[in-house]
């Protein structure tokens, strides 16, 4: 599996990103497992993103655990307030 790819404009701070991932947005204080796609203008903060997850463009994820094989559509906000939010949206799949 190829290493993670950080495209121009991506910003990753205090995060661990698994192999096969493609990062186009911002990732802070988070753990991303293998084959995670972070779309353009996405923000991921204080979250755990499991294997094979697709985050569409302009998505905001904070204080969440996103389950494996999940697709988050573009322009979506998931924010856990006061506790961790678990997100499972299995609507579409993609391959990296």
How would you describe each model-predicted region?
Residues 1-96:
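Left-handed beta-helix
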């Amino acid at each position: 599996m190829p290493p993670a790819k950080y495209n121009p404009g991506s910003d990753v701070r205090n995060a661990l990103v698994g192999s096969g991932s493609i990062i186009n947005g911002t990732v802070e204080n988070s753990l991303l497992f293998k084959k995670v796609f972070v779309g353009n203008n996405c923000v991921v903060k204080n979250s755990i993103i499991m294997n094979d997850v697709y985050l569409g463009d302009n998505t905001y994820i904070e204080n969440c655990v996103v389950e494996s094989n999940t697709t988050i559509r573009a322009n979506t906000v998931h924010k856990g307030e006061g506790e961790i939010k678990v997100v499972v949206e299995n609507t579409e799949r993609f391959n990296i």
